[in-house]
UniProtKB/Swiss-Prot annotation:
The gene is Myl3. Residues 1-42 are annotated as: Disordered. One of its GO terms (molecular function) is calcium ion binding. The keyword DNA damage does not apply. The modification Phosphothreonine is found at T93, T132, T134. This is Myosin light chain 3.
Length: 200
């Protein structure tokens, strides 16, 4: 008879005391927030004026309407710059206006003056860099507040958002904007609301 082969030993690890679990790795340090790219400073000398002479003449006439200097020196205050831009059909945010003005201090807005030659490159820059949202952008932004998914938002919530976020509107501005938009339940169809705003 052939000798018996020894049976393989069972894994001793199963019978031995379990090994201690390795210590958990230290939590990774929170990644620093990436730096926002710095906005390039506005440099009027690098702006190429592309308006026609006729357009420039029209702009000059509009600019002159805002001139409050005693001798009609063709100057406006920094604080009037946004108003003149908007009167000429542009729609810059207050932040954009302040950026092209070189981010003046609050007290400088009513004291510092600019002439038309200083203003024209600002107008050219703002008119070329229109970053206005599309209908879809606005609808998508309001859809966030559509809790029911039925195409409406609460009028009270929209009032609050318009008065407290981004470029805040005054109570009067909010009321004018929302006049006649709410249904009997205080809800607003936001697609119709965006069409109403964009048509204004």
């Amino acid at each position: 008879m052939a000798p018996k082969k020894p049976e393989p030993k069972k894994d001793d690890a199963k019978t031995a005391a379990p090994k201690a679990a390795p210590a958990p790795a230290a939590a990774p340090a929170a990644a620093p927030e990436p730096e926002r790219p710095k906005e390039a400073e506005f440099d009027a000398s690098k702006i190429k004026i592309e308006f026609t002479p006729e357009q420039i003449e029209e702009f000059k006439e509009a600019f002159q309407l805002f001139d409050r200097t005693p001798k009609g020196e063709m100057k406006i205050t920094y604080g009037q710059c946004g108003d003149v831009l908007r009167a000429l059909g542009q729609n810059p945010t207050q932040a954009e206006v302040l950026r092209v003005l070189g981010k003046p201090k609050q007290e400088e807005l009513n004291s510092k003056m600019m002439d038309f030659e200083t203003f024209l490159p600002m107008l050219q820059h703002i008119s070329k860099n229109k970053d206005t949202g599309t209908y879809e952008d606005f609808v998508e932004g309001l859809r966030v507040f559509d809790k029911e998914g039925n195409g409406t938002v609460m009028g009270a919530e929209l009032r609050h958002v318009l008065a407290t976020l981004g470029e805040r509107l005054t109570e009067d501005e909010v009321e004018k904007l929302m006049a006649g938009q709410e249904d009997s339940n205080g809800c607003i169809n936001y697609e119709a609301f965006v069409k109403h705003i964009m048509a204004s």
